[in-house]
Amino acid sequence: GVLPDEKQVKIGVTYMTMNNDFYKTLNAELEKKTNQQGSRLYVRDPELDEGKQSQQIDFFVREKVDVIVINPVKSNSPSIISSLQKAKKAGIKIIVVDAPISQDVKVDTTIVSDNYQAGVLIAQDMMKRLPSANILLLEHRNAVSAMDRIQGFIDTIEKQPSYKIISQKETLGQTEETMPQVKGALDEGLDFNVVMALNDRAAIGALAAIKNQGLDKKISIYGVDGSPDIKNFLATTSDIEGTVAQSPIQMGRKVAQVIELMQEGKSYDSQYLIPVHLVNRDNISQYTVTGWQ
């Protein structure tokens, strides 16, 4: 608990969206740990709107929070960057989670999954399973984390002419945005046998769209996150080829740990990379399918 003479630490938190269990889980872990530390959390949801997120940061500055934890709606958004610069001037510490922010603002630390490696792992698994592939990429172009995954994938297949990217669609990493995009690709007659989705939400949207078409050919679908939904598909069906597990729990824990170091005036790193792991039908039995890792 908080000693009477200690100032309660105030933490402003804004994730790009709460319409994703990854952020809900990360936040639940952060709440649990910071409650134990006696801190006060202000959590806001910008709903993928950069203007809204920038206003939320301005609100945190007015509230005189000690720390801002941000997962940016858009990594190079001028309005978000300008609000963060105001926060820095006010002496507020800034922790960026899950997707880095552009270099224009000096943040205190960035805590992200090894997103590039996630793309590499998927490409390697696909090449092991398939002698050739026509690939549909599902993207979220504003999110650096998502584009790093796509880049890792592209770089890994680059020198292999039998693996071709035939189309790239913007999905915002949301299931409901993905379904019409993939349906459109199928309606156009695009011939693909692999879907590389930036996250599990997009992978599930792709699966729904493909199932609705009742295709007789096999399309291999990959996601990234290791969400309970996808792990359940991996454990019980052959609909999904694989995902790369991130750990929102570990990420939330690391954020809380760094906040504690900041409060104690101890040193901490400017970047923490959280390792990622390929999950497929061969190793799904080693994972819990009910929750996150």
Label every model-predicted segment:
Residues 77, 81-117, 134, 227-236, ...:
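Flexible loop/hinge segments that line or gate small-molecule binding clefts
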Residues 22-37, 118-122, 145-163, 177, ...:
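Short, solvent-exposed amphipathic alpha-helices that sit
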Residues 156-157, 247-293:
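Hinge/cleft segment of the Venus flytrap/periplasmic-binding protein
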Residues 73-87, 153, 172-231:
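Hydrophobic alpha-helical
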Residues 12-13, 65-74, 93-97, 136-137, ...:
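Periplasmic-binding protein-like
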Residues 43-45, 102-125, 137-140, 236-249:
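Short beta-strand elements at the ligand-binding edges of bilobed clamshell
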Residues 10-29, 33, 42-55, 59, ...:
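Extracytoplasmic "Venus flytrap"
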Residues 11, 53, 110-134, 147-148, ...:
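Hydrophobic alpha-helical segments within soluble ligand-binding/sensing domains
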